[in-house]
Design a protein with these regions (language model features):
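The Walker A/P-loop phosphate-binding site
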Residues: 2-102, 111-120, 289-292
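Flexible beta-alpha connector loops of hexameric P-loop NTPases
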Residues: 51, 97-108, 139-156, 189-195, ...
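Loop/turn-to-beta-strand initiation segments
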Residues: 73-74, 122-125, 170-178
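Catalytic P-loop NTPase motifs of RecA-like helicase/translocase cores
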Residues: 84, 134-135, 185
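Phosphate-binding/switch region of NTP-binding enzymes
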Residues: 117, 149-269
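Conserved P-loop NTPase "ATPase switch" module shared by AAA+ and STAND
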Residues: 122-140
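Long, well-ordered amphipathic alpha-helical subdomains in the mid-to-C-terminal portions
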Residues: 258-290
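Terminal-proximal interaction/regulatory segments of ATP-powered molecular machines
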Residues: 277-328
Length: 328
């Protein structure tokens, strides 16, 4: 054992009683319903894959996460589609003045910069939006019609191998989030999925957490569409229970609605009671609103009341909260 450590370095061989904390450190996504299903947030020092169809809410989730990650250090956003919207970022709580924004053309240069940032140990989180926007230099400098089969996947695989090997060695806690698009799986037949993600199997394999993000319905006030509902499925989760489902809402112009999630949890815990369509505080009887949307909005718009119920839920014993793992 001593020879192995001398030859390959400290940490090359360990035992189970080395004092490693089994409660893996995480950073909240800023979305209560999602945090609940992934063990509290995205795991530090790991790769996360957010994938789904366009307009489902992937970038919004990534920005909400960055707002939380900024509390722990420097954050970077690689805008590979030239679609970064500072207003949307601020809406999700991001301090845009402190956010490092990168526009790098070639995939090779972009991946090298991501590796450099991650290995400094000074960056809390990196978001790459999107993986589909990573364009190999050969494609940029070549002609339309040139074939570059598998090149993007090979470059990604090489970079992610380097990251997954070197990040633990340098004690880097950087969380790298790839936003990925779905594309048609040409040639799929039988029970094979009709859709796949860009870049081959590299991100699928190296990501510790993979979340399928989809839009499942509209939110309306009368005839006006005011938002939509999002469903996140944890297709892969190495550090928590996989195959969990989180449902939550995003309100246009306001951001993610944690009020609805908090309302459901508080009702399940008996902190809020429902009588007909009315919601009220279980202790004081103070009304929160008529209907779920109104009550959820009341919680979202009053930070003091929201925080009071959130802290009350945290103080409850585990068996007093609804922790079902069933699919909706």
């Amino acid at each position: 054992i001593a020879e192995t450590k001398k030859e390959h370095g400290h940490g090359s061989v360990t035992t189970d009683d080395t004092g490693v904390d089994t409660d893996f450190p995480k950073i909240s996504t800023g979305i209560l319903a999602l945090d609940e299903k992934i063990g509290g947030g995205f795991p530090k020092g790991r790769i996360v894959d957010l994938y789904g169809p366009e307009g489902s809410g992937k970038t919004g989730i990534a920005l909400s996460f960055l707002a939380q990650a900024k509390k722990e250090g420097i954050c970077a956003f690689f805008d590979l589609e030239d679609a970064y919207d500072p207003n949307m970022a601020r809406l999700n709580g991001v301090d845009t003045k402190e956010l490092l924004l990168f526009h790098i053309e070639a995939m090779e240069d972009c991946l090298e910069k991501i590796i450099d940032l991650a290995l400094t140990g000074e960056v809390a989180a990196i978001v790459v939006d999107s993986f589909a926007g990573l364009t190999p230099r050969a494609e940029i400098e070549g002609d339309i019609g040139d074939s570059h089969v598998g090149l993007q996947g090979r470059l990604a695989s090489q970079a992610l191998r380097i990251l997954t090997k070197k990040m633990p060695a340098t004690n880097s806690d950087t969380i790298i989030v790839f936003v990925n698009q779905l594309r048609s799986n040409i040639g799929a037949f039988g029970h094979e999925s009709k859709h796949t993600v860009t870049g081959g199997r590299a991100v699928k394999f190296y990501a510790s957490t993979r979340i399928n993000v989809s839009k499942v319905g509209q939110l309306k006030r009368g005839d006006e569409v005011i938002g939509h509902s999002i469903r996140c499925k944890t297709e892969k989760c190495r550090l928590y229970k996989p195959f969990q489902v989180a449902d939550f809402d995003v309100l246009y112009g306001k951001g993610f609605s944690n009020g609805g999630t908090l309302l459901e949890q508080a009702v399940a815990a008996g902190l809020i009671v429902k009588s007909g369509n009315w919601y009220a505080d279980a202790t004081t009887g103070e009304s929160l609103g008529n209907g779920k949307n109104a009550a959820a909005e009341a919680l979202s718009e009053d930070p003091e009341v929201f925080e009071r119920y959130r802290l009350a839920l945290l103080d409850l014993p585990d068996d007093e909260t609804d922790d079902t793992d069933e699919f909706p």
